[in-house]
Curated annotation (Swiss-Prot):
It is a single-pass type II membrane protein. It is found in: Cell inner membrane. The keyword Cell membrane applies. The gene is ccmE. This is Cytochrome c-type biogenesis protein CcmE. Gene3D superfamilies: Nucleic acid-binding proteins. Belongs to the CcmE/CycJ family. One of its GO terms (cellular component) is plasma membrane.
């Protein structure tokens, strides 16, 4: 190999090494700004029930779920609010200091972004409320569909009408027919 080719190869290798190092540093810096989305069940048991995917305490995450009825507690001396959020399973507690969105209320869907302070405690820096009464965060609705369909829960069950309700209606109509 002549000296000219050798110097070109050396320059190319140093440029590639520099680009690789710069790319690695950029990706490492961005890693801290990426907020992964979890449901409350995934915060506790991991994505797809894999314990290796449970978020670590101190990690920035986004949690989407429904505000549990009767769990909203407001500090009378400040803007601190705490409430529980669940999807179809366990609950986690969210603490937030600030003004909540106008559409925030119990029983409604929210997405909270913040830092996981304890395995079941999220210190939120931002709380986003749903848009209307039919809104459910997309990831949460997918998870609910995955859980409800295999269990044999029908759309009527999801709307509050169970097999027992349908059976009671049928029995009542038969009894009325006998009269």
């Amino acid at each position: 190999m002549n000296p000219r080719r050798k110097s070109r190869l050396t320059i190319i290798l140093f440029v590639l090494l520099g680009v690789t190092i710069a790319s690695s540093l950029v990706l490492y810096a961005l890693r801290q700004n990426i907020d992964l989305f979890y449901t409350p069940s995934e915060v506790i048991s991991g994505k797809n029930d894999d314990p290796d995917t449970i978020p670590e305490v101190g990690q920035r995450i986004r949690v989407g779920g429904m505000v549990v009825e009767g769990t909203v507690k407001r500090d009378p001396n400040s803007l601190k609010v705490s409430f529980n959020v669940n999807d179809i399973g366990p609950e986690i507690t969210v603490e937030y200091e600030g003004i909540l969105p106008d559409l925030f209320r119990e029983g409604q869907g929210i997405v909270a972004q913040g830092v996981l302070k304890e395995p079941k405690l999220l210190e939120a820096t931002e709380v986003l409320a749903k848009h209307d009464e039919n809104y459910v965060p997309p990831d949460l609705s997918e998870k609910m569909e995955q859980v409800h369909k295999p269990m044999g829960i029908s759309n009527q069950d999801m709307q509050g009408e169970s097999d027992r309700d349908r059976l009671d209606k049928a029995v009542n109509s038969v009894e009325e027919g006998k009269k």
